[in-house]
Amino acid sequence: MAKFFSLGLLLASIWTTRLLVQGSLRSEEISILGPCRIMGVTLVTKKTQPLLNFTEAQEACRLVGLTLASQDQVEEARKFGFETCSYGWVKNQFVVIPRIISNPKCGKSGVGVVIWRSSLSSRHRSYCHNSSDIWINSCLPEIITTDDPLFNTETATYTTKLMVSDSTHSELSTDGPDYVTTTVAPPLASTSTPRKRKLICITEAFMDTSAVATERESDIQNRPAFKNEAVGFGGVPTALLVLALLFFAAAAGLAVCYVKRYVKAFPFTNKNQQKEMIETKVVKEEKADDSNPNEESKKMNKTPEEPKSPPKTTVRCLEAEV
């Protein structure tokens, strides 16, 4: 019961004090020193003496639409140039003077927020704060910058996106979009169409000599590589296939020219020449040796000269896809 009685008495005293303060302070008596607020902080005083105690300082700030500032808020304002030469109440229940330059007449030559602890009934001015200020100086349109990690991250992200967009736009034409969408086309399926194969054979006749044998060996060695090249034409374009056919035609023409040039090497021509030579020789011997029939018969009985071994033929085949 005693606790409830003491609590009611306390509330009644506070209410009575508030009524007394409200009755003693009027908004016409309150004056704001300076038209501008720094970081929302300004100095409020009373036009007439005496000045304000701690309770009256709170009420004075309320009458001008502000709240009693704290020591930290006054320190923040001092960093941006807020400086006075008057002690004033703060929320921490002591009086302070914000100083930037040392002055023996202001705060005993102190620098910073000079603190003086005095009784709550002592008379001083008050430092009030406006929490809705977004400018460093309320008289200048300069936005307050804060060290917010989230704000810094968003700013960095925006800058990065802007740089990427600018570099992309510089690479594109003036009529193109601001963003590039890269699409990867699927690889085309390789379609293989059946091709006809044509076999070209060239027959060449040579006498059985060492030179011909050497050439035949070189042809045998080069033939597999040539066939491999022909087989590899399966996937080449039409232009390369046409070039290959022209190459084969040129080879055939060279072979024909070679045969015409060395036509004496054919066996049929050699046999005709051998017959003509034998007949001429027989006629000469008959005219010269009519008186000697025995010798003529011996000569006639002689076996004709054996012809050379029949020539060997080689076949050269070329396989190409058409």
Swiss-Prot record:
Keywords on this record?
Answer: Disulfide bond, Glycoprotein, Membrane, Receptor, Signal, Transmembrane, Transmembrane helix, Transport
Residue positions the entry lists as glycosylated? N53
Question: Taking every annotated instance into account, which residue ranges of this chain make up the domain Link?
Answer: 40-130
Write out the transmembrane intervals: 239-259
Reported function: Ligand-specific transporter trafficking between intracellular organelles (TGN) and the plasma membrane. Plays a role in autocrine regulation of cell growth mediated by growth regulators containing cell surface retention sequence binding (CRS). May act as a hyaluronan (HA) transporter, either mediating its uptake for catabolism within lymphatic endothelial cells themselves, or its transport into the lumen of afferent lymphatic vessels for subsequent re-uptake and degradation in lymph nodes.
Q: What binding partners and quaternary form does the record give? A: Homodimer; disulfide-linked. Interacts with PDGFB and IGFBP3. Forms a transient ternary complex with PDGFB and PDGFRB in TGN.
- In its UniProt entry, what is this protein called? Lymphatic vessel endothelial hyaluronic acid receptor 1
Q: Which organism is it from?
A: Bos taurus
